[in-house]
Amino acid sequence: MKLKETLNLGQTAFPMRAGLPNKEPQWQEAWDQADIYKKRQALNEGKPAFHLHDGPPYANGNIHVGHALNKISKDIIVRSKSMSGFRAPYVPGWDTHGLPIEQVLAKKGVKRKEMDLAEYLEMCRDYALSQVDKQRDDFKRLGVSADWENPYITLTPDYEADQVRVFGAMADKGYIYRGAKPVYWSWSSESALAEAEIEYHDIDSTSLYYANKVKDGKGILDTDTYIVVWTTTPFTVTASRGLTVGPDMEYVVVVPVGSERKYLLAEVLVDSLAAKFGWENFEIVTHHTGKELNHIVTEHPWDTEVEELVILGDHVTTDSGTGIVHTAPGFGEDDYNVGIANGLDVVVTVDSRGLMMENAGPDFEGQFYDKVTPLVKEKLGDLLLASEVINHSYPFDWRTKKPIIWRAVPQWFASVSKFRQEILDEIEKTNFQPEWGKKRLYNMIRDRGDWVISRQRAWGVPLPIFYAEDGTAIMTKEVTDHVADLFAEYGSIVWWQRDAKDLLPAGYTHPGSPNGLFEKETDIMDVWFDSGSSWNGVMNARENLSYPADLYLEGSDQYRGWFNSSLITSVAVNGHAPYKAVLSQGFVLDGKGEKMSKSLGNTILPSDVEKQFGAEILRLWVTSVDSSNDVRISMDILKQTSETYRKIRNTLRFLIANTSDFNPKQDAVAYENLGAVDRYMTIKFNQVVDTINKAYAAYDFMAIYKAVVNFVTVDLSAFYLDFAKDVVYIEAANSPERRRMQTVFYDILVKLTKLLTPILPHTAEEIWSYLEHEEEEFVQLAEMPVAQTFSGQEEILEEWSAFMTLRTQAQKALEEARNAKVIGKSLEAHLTIYASQEVKTLLTALNSDIALLMIVSQLTIADEADKPADSVSFEGVAFTVEHAEGEVCERSRRIDPTTKMRSYGVAVCDASAAIIEQYYPEAVAQGFEA
């Protein structure tokens, strides 16, 4: 035999190269076949519940890396809870109604208005379900464990019915009303939009400064006075019915030199505006407060028969403009509020497609609203004082990426104002992570208007409202409950398939319909009402779930989206929030911190990562970043993550290989019988177990990542395993020293594998398949380890911390000797430590082979007073390094004075010779092969 065969060189088939792109699908198939999700749920039956409610992604297209961050985060939380004594079912969901699907069909050539509505809606449904299947496969490829067979989908009949019941409950409490308030109007979608459907972009717009002539100055202003107005939306001048001034602002009337006109404008802006208007000199003739100007009458700039009333408004500022804003109640929220309060007419001159209407005047009719600025300037004539291009933030339809307008049209609203304080009180009771989320959502609810819930589209849940002959809206509990029952049985498509009377309860009558005739609403609900009702359609509806949920986890954009709409509906119906805690995440940016976009070519798809690295690397990346803020990802970042994964994997592979002959039931050594350094590592590892368990409970993935990486690279690879291999390789297979270390190896291997399972389930399962002494078939069916504490552990940790400092100093001395060519490898060294009594006491207390721990062949501890002049000192401790005496033992690779050529043909030290002669007599008799 060969000499190396006398060494216990750990053997394992566990591969160094992970091959994740190929292996992960195999593991996922094995989990499906074994029905792991259901088995885990069955194991947890009767345990305390933890319910994370899945915010539904929109079912359109493959998932992006933001989806991956979110879904992996949820999976880590649910897996860790499931392995930590909680019944934690996870029901995934999809949002399936809305404009994007209509747009996809339109791009495919489907013409909605030229076909039967029921047929069109069926096409929408089929497409949505195809996208659900696509995304389900994408999420499963990430290794996400969920009830994939029973997801919630917002287009299913039972869900639609529960959504209608939420609406009915809100209507029954008087929270639903119809109004003609200005709403965000998307001409590109031909529909109203909610605030959550708006995004802002910087654009260039033409702003106009023009003047309205005073018609009735109320004894305050002369009729030859003109009030100077500013607008950034010239098309709205066609619907202007008032001029708003700040009640406490100071205004002046000025006369430019050479002009026959007087102009009123804010006093603080006179100089800047005079320069803008080309007034070289002017005279201030009178001063006025805004309150003094109230109810002065002016003429519309070109339609002089239309009067525009001066009114007061707190929204007027002097940050820009003239201190006076023209007021078109049909085209703005502030305009509407002050206009209604002062009896102004609400005029809308733009239709649903963005085209100017007949009431705008014959010159404007039929033109696109954004193209009429030249005509407005022409109509203003000499009343136009200046025109300039400004760059400002403007709202866009987040789906079509087209600008929107404010437009007053009859819509259905949910009144937030009626129960706003209840919502705010519930926010105060909710836990937020990060903490700033509480203030963000609080301020949003505090400042938001009522919620426009109607949409002028086809693909969605119909508003369950009927109209009597006299126009009375009917949405009583009796009616909405009946509609909900119909939806539960037939789906919401029944709304379009039946006449109004056939949708009402049998024999239904209403005093407003003496002839028994009814009409039904044709608008659908805002999709945020769909997803915002999920607490009722899912958490409150399924027996294995509970409401309110323990946790909602989504991107920070959902403060104005799902967090917001769910909170409103839940408080409206039941008086409490739908969640106990909210965790939000930032956006995923590219490696340079830029937003990802196809046009920039900087997008990274999960499928790309899976093909190149494997989903495990994406999962590990999720734990390596602070996702409460925006995070960065790139292929270079993922390469670094892959390198970290490799270190973790290879360390665990070493532990597998070097416990392959270890049976924990027969060979394990009790803690009190372990060596001193083994006890230290056991204590140290249990601290890591405690840190990781607490971090899982706090959803602090980064803390887990840091704890694992630090323990694997510093405590294990750079310390314990670095010298332990000299014991497990060299000592006799059954020696107490080797079994002590194998006990620690195996304990770390099993427990660390469990701890890593929520993050790296594929790798953990692969490792588990090599642990033949563990009972559970799959590691996902095991329980998380519980951290142990040991008597005197604080003192032990303190002693070893001091030793680790000494070891670092010794390594510096060895490095200097290496550089000076005194030694090559550290095993060639004889290290002398000139120790104080304190250091001697420490080394004695450790009760360990210090030479082994220092990875030197020979070590001497001398008195501090005896240090020679050529010693080197680090932090008060002196060292000398000499070449060790003796020859290299061919078996242990240590230099030992007892090393000599043996009769069986190898030069080994006495310790190795004793092992060879006891355990390998045949080799002793025959000699070793060269």
UniProtKB/Swiss-Prot annotation:
Family, as annotated: Belongs to the class-I aminoacyl-tRNA synthetase family. IleS type 1 subfamily.
Species classification: Bacteria, Bacillati, Bacillota, Bacilli, Lactobacillales
Predominant place of localization: cytoplasm
Protein's recorded name: Isoleucine--tRNA ligase
Residues where L-isoleucyl-5'-AMP binds: E554
Function: Catalyzes the attachment of isoleucine to tRNA(Ile). As IleRS can inadvertently accommodate and process structurally similar amino acids such as valine, to avoid such errors it has two additional distinct tRNA(Ile)-dependent editing activities. One activity is designated as 'pretransfer' editing and involves the hydrolysis of activated Val-AMP. The other activity is designated 'posttransfer' editing and involves deacylation of mischarged Val-tRNA(Ile).
Keywords: Aminoacyl-tRNA synthetase, ATP-binding, Cytoplasm, Ligase, Nucleotide-binding, Protein biosynthesis
Motif 'HIGH' region: positions: 57-67
Gene3D superfamilies reported for this sequence: 1.10.730.20, HUPs, Ile-tRNA synthetase CP2 domain-like
NCBIfam families recorded: ileS (TIGR00392)
UniProt catalytic activity: tRNA(Ile) + L-isoleucine + ATP = L-isoleucyl-tRNA(Ile) + AMP + diphosphate
